[in-house]
Amino acid sequence: MYWKTDTIEIPDWDRHSLLDRLEPFDPATPRELADQMVAYCRFYGLDLWVEHPEVVYHQGYVEAGRHQVMVHYYRLPESFTPRGTVFILHGYFDHVGLYSQLIDRCLGAGFDVLAYDQPGHGLSSGTPAAIGSFIEYQGVLSDVMAHVQPKVRQPWFAVGQSTGGAILIDYLLSNSHSQETS
């Protein structure tokens, strides 16, 4: 695991308090992050606005099926001529907090980044690490993409690790995408 500190810190946040304060994802509405959310981001190295002060960080939830899915969005300024948005889909038993290095690399390469916690993982709702059917993951991806479509830059790229990769492949195969549209 990757921490940005030399010592292990005791988390200065409570998951239930964070969930109670989550608001709908809307990058058009700037919001001050609660101290506990800043502590959460710092603990997992997601506070990339410290290393990239030009980046604007947005977070909130998206209604996806029967779940509230936590979305993290890192947006570069127009002056950087962003190349699009990279979606990051994590694996089983993971959450976005494990991908700070990948997010950092994508930002450094000129991409905005959107990552979300799968249902039952991280700060998303749902029974921990459980899903009724794998097709639910595909539905969540579809709902997240539909919700953010008018709000995040295109073109879109995607990276999926383990279960996240399977979700992407399943989505592309199930929705009859061609090489040009995938």
Language model feature labels by segment:
Residues M1-E63, V69-L76:
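An N-terminal hydrophobic leader/cap segment in hydrolases
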Residues P82-G91:
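Short beta-strand element of the alpha/beta-hydrolase
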Residues R83-G84, G110-F111, Q154-P155:
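Short coil/turn segments at beta-strand junctions that form active-site/ligand-binding loops
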Residues Y92-L98, G122-V152:
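Catalytic nucleophile-loop/oxyanion-hole region of alpha/beta-hydrolase
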Residues I103-G126:
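Conserved alpha/beta-hydrolase
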Residues K151-S162:
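Alpha/beta-hydrolase fold nucleophile elbow
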Residues S178-S182:
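A conserved short beta-strand
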